[in-house]
């Protein structure tokens, strides 16, 4: 039976909220595709960064008090280019605990990303990646619970729904993964990505989550870290591709997401949608608890759209992320299908061993040909975590200006 359309008077709070949603999407440059879904203005990296700009600006505004207090205390942990000796880089992982200055440093570094990062969900392992040669920060890593539904992951593993429900506990997602300046200028991002697959991470996982209860199921499970997923927010990644040391691949591309999500709904608009649901006494308005799953925000927006008579297809932004897997165990797929009982970590290297290989493979050669990293000053980091519009950081055009003018979004 066909669902009846929701009719809203033009002068109600609902109508004003709908106009705000349409105006926001129009400002970002979205239009309706032939099938009624949203069509993004472009798939270029510049356009994708521009689409995230308002969300990132809102986030930096929310954190400005923290940045103002933390930056003077923590700035010294970021390197000047002159302090980096590529041939002597010695990476070390430090597990971050909540409520520490290391946690503040992790938070500060994550705010420099051009695409806002997630806070993670459920189980979490957060790391600072240090260069023990100079005591400076190379980058950050955050591993957390994976999303339940990820088609390309499930297909490459060969999972049934029952398999996934029983064994997803053996999978993590790298939701933050990257290097900070000046290390990112000499392919430090490749080093950081490879450090995910190390003995130290395996041991930390086993110690912290080896005997755990499922966030959703509440059942006790003996978890063995078999596989880690990650995705590139800017389409195909030059950092993640060809990520191999010797004969061992560290990240393998397996396909793209289908472009569903909520990044195009910034925090300020999301707050208005929640307030609308609160006034309607809808259960999702204040339902964010870990046990309710990682997709609460998506479900909340969908519920608000449904109440407003907006098609849920407006949550399909069309920006597909390239998905990668890191097969932590050599028998990862068999273990996840239930064909093996015990994870085999054959050939798993230490942080020191991976660091030596990555240094020789990528960082030293890049530093020899691209010497601009030497000119980086740590004082420049402040511009990366400022909510003010920066010449170096803000896209020069809005998404709508990047491509030719298109038809505006009308109707629902």
Model-derived features with residue positions:
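Extended, composition-driven regions rather than compact fold-specific motifs
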Residues: 1-412
């Amino acid at each position: 039976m066909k669902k009846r359309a929701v009719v809203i008077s033009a002068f109600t709070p609902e109508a004003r909220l709908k106009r705000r949603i349409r105006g926001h999407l129009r400002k970002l440059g979205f239009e309706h595709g032939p099938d009624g879904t949203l069509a993004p203005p472009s798939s270029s990296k510049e356009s994708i960064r521009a689409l995230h700009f308002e969300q990132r600006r809102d986030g930096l505004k929310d954190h400005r008090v923290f940045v103002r207090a933390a930056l003077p205390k923590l700035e010294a942990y970021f390197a000047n280019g002159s302090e980096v000796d590529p041939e002597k880089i010695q990476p070390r992982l430090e597990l971050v605990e909540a409520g520490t200055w290391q946690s503040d440093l992790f938070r500060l570094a994550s705010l420099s990303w051009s695409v806002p990062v997630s806070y993670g969900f459920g189980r979490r392992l957060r790391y600072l990646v240090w260069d023990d040669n100079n005591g400076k920060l190379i980058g950050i890593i955050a591993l957390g619970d994976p999303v339940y539904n990820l088609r390309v992951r499930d297909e490459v593993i060969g999972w049934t729904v029952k398999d996934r429900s029983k064994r997803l506990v053996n999978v993590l997602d790298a939701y933050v993964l990257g290097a900070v300046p000046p290390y990112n200028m000499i392919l430090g991002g490749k080093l950081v990505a490879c450090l995910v697959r190390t003995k130290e991470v395996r041991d930390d996982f086993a110690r912290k989550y080896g005997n755990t209860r499922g966030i959703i199921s509440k059942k006790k499970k003996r978890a063995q870290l078999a596989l880690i997923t990650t995705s590139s927010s800017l389409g195909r990644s030059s950092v993640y591709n060809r990520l191999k040391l010797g004969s061992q691949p560290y990240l393998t591309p397996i396909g793209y997401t289908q472009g569903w999500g909520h990044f195009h709904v910034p925090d300020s608009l999301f707050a208005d949608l929640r307030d609308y649901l609160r006034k309607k006494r809808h259960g999702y308005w204040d339902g964010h608890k870990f046990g309710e799953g990682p997709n609460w925000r998506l479900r909340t927006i969908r519920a608000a759209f449904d109440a407003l008579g907006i098609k849920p297809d407006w949550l399909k932004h069309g920006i597909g992320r390239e998905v990668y897997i890191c097969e932590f165990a050599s028998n990862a797929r068999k273990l996840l299908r239930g064909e093996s009982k015990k994870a085999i970590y054959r050939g798993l290297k230490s942080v020191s061993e991976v660091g030596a290989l990555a240094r020789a493979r990528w960082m030293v050669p890049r530093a020899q040909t691209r010497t601009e990293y030497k000119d980086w000053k740590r004082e420049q980091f402040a511009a990366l975590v400022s909510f003010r519009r920066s010449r170096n950081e803000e896209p020069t055009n809005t998404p709508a200006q990047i491509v030719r003018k298109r038809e505006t979004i009308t109707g629902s």
